[in-house]
């Protein structure tokens, strides 16, 4: 709900590269954060930052999995760290928690069923069988992470960049659905949410409103119901 993490993390990685260059001299490098086909989770695992959970995300033994990954490619000769062994054991809480059954087996994710994919990447209508499990989620889903015991160690981000802005953490679905395209662009400027565009924003909220009809002030409002149906088409 804060600033676009792609930009924040890339900027911080670039500053890190500049500090390294100041210490060792010019060196070849490039930074990434969800900005290129880089296997960030697997690279992080091999770098010893954690192990891959059954939900396919990286788990750090002291920070859980609720963090962003960024990558700094370099041509500097560095000593490789040892990979962290798996600590998930027989736990399957993340698999059981997934609302749409997207984690089809340990370490295997069917992205076509993942709520994060459906609400962020998918263009067009969300398949009807997957609408009800989405519940009131309108941008992504973290249920598999919330269910993970290792996230008892997770802490809120310390950077003010990631603090919720514009009341997004308290707004009702009806209020958000009423945003015009201009208001959407203005209030979500600098946020990763803006990337999905106003049309998909309305589609996602329409699905959520359909799932909570009668609980969020929609029932009986003919104009609102008509707008929801139009967004779902």
Name each region found by the language model.
Residues 202-219, 233:
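Structural detector for internal amphipathic alpha-helices that build alpha-solenoid repeat scaffolds
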Residues 1-87, 126, 135:
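Auxiliary alpha/beta "docking" domains used to position bulky ligands
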Residues 93-117, 123, 137-161, 227-232:
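Iron-sulfur cluster-binding cysteine motifs and their immediate structural context
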Residues 128-161, 179, 183-186, 190-194, ...:
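C-terminal amphipathic alpha-helical segment
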Residues 78-85, 105, 125-128, 151-158, ...:
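Inter-helical turn/loop segments and adjacent helix faces that build the functional surface
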Residues 113-129, 163-181:
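Short microdomains enriched in Cys/His and/or Lys/Arg
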Residues 185-187, 216-232:
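Amphipathic alpha-helical scaffolding segments comprising HEAT/armadillo-like alpha-solenoid repeats
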Residues 83-93, 103-106, 194:
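Flavin-dependent oxidoreductase catalytic cores
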